[in-house]
Amino acid sequence: MISVATAECFTHGKIGIKIHKMACGYRELEKDPNYGIINGNVFVMASMFLPSKKGIESILNVKLPEPDYVFKYSKAYTQENDILVAKMVANALKNKLKCNIAISSTAGVGKGAVCILTDNNEYVFTSDVYGDLIKGENILKRQTNGLNKSFDTFVEILKKEYGLK
């Protein structure tokens, strides 16, 4: 069984929840074309929604850079720093839980960033939707796109690296 853990911000823990539902055999997802790839092959160790810098640092024992923008209690970075932070969080999560695959997401101003870290490779990508957390622009569109792109990438990794079909 392939172990997975997520520490998510702009995807609100939805990547991990979707993987968990398929892994556990939720009937409403049985018709999904990727159900058979995940069910019986993957389990979720943890799926966390971590919007704050303090929460991430406390739980994962990692020191993140100071946010580029002030936004209530949540962290908000530039596109460049979102990529850096996504990598840092995925590495900290993988080190902490010793899972096979660690997934992290973060988004401030820009397209956000997702890092999927496996035992062999690091995959870093953005959503296809520009959003601005500070101004509240395109937040839900970016989230939906990031969730779908992350899940599709996760499935492709299972096929490519783990030979699942």
Curated annotation (Swiss-Prot):
InterPro entries linked to this entry: HcgF
Superkingdom, natural source: Archaea
NCBIfam families found in the cross-reference section: PRK00962.1
Family the UniProt entry places it in: Belongs to the UPF0254 family.
Name of the protein: UPF0254 protein MmarC5_0742
Organism of this sequence: Methanococcus maripaludis (strain C5 / ATCC BAA-1333)
